[in-house]
Amino acid sequence: MEDFYVEDYLVKGDRYYTKEHEWVRVKNGFAEVGITDYAQKQLGDIVYVDLPEKGKEVDAGDTLANIESVKNVAPVYAPVTGTVVEVNEDLKDEPGIINDDPYEAGWIAVIEMKDPTEVEDLMTAQDYAEYLKEIVEEEKEEEVEVKEEELIETESIEELSEEELGYEENK
């Protein structure tokens, strides 16, 4: 599964997404939940995360957590129905992890899903990238592209000359 970029916003290919900009990574009936790169950039510097309690029963659409940034307080909605079985305790001391790594270290909670087929109601990465494209185009008032990660041109450090790297070999 390919990752996508809409402008500078990363959309991970191995997740499902909501229109409220939450992501879900499903594994063996469990849903790891977090917020998207777009959401964390819109919030700005995150200063506090009000995490759910382990054992909390949630229905899809219920408030799962609240994220406080220097700009705003925003709810994080449960994308699926089930029971919270794990929360990211690291966010209590370092809520900015969400800004640094929203898709991995910045996860918020794990929900044991009541009905694993519920994820079929969520958007795929490609669908979310197209949805995000519309939002960004409206914000910028111009067209933007959805790019697959492999199509983004990068030069590996080995391909750069010593001059381009800013140093020369000692002779």
Swiss-Prot record:
Family of this protein: Belongs to the GcvH family.
Name of the protein this chain belongs to: Glycine cleavage system H protein 4
Subunit-level organization: The glycine cleavage system is composed of four proteins: P, T, L and H.
InterPro entries: Biotin_lipoyl (IPR000089), GCV_H (IPR002930), GCV_H/Fam206 (IPR033753), GCV_H_sub (IPR017453), Single_hybrid_motif (IPR011053)
HAMAP family for the chain: GcvH
Keywords, alphabetical: Lipoyl
Region (Disordered): 139-171
Pfam families reported for this sequence: GCV_H
Residues with the N6-lipoyllysine modification: 71
Cofactor or coenzyme needed: (R)-lipoate
Keyword Cell division assigned: no
Cofactor comment: Binds 1 lipoyl cofactor covalently.
Residues annotated as transmembrane: none
Summary of the function given for this chain in its UniProt record: The glycine cleavage system catalyzes the degradation of glycine. The H protein shuttles the methylamine group of glycine from the P protein to the T protein.
Keyword match Transport: no
Occurrences of domain Lipoyl-binding (ranges): 30-112
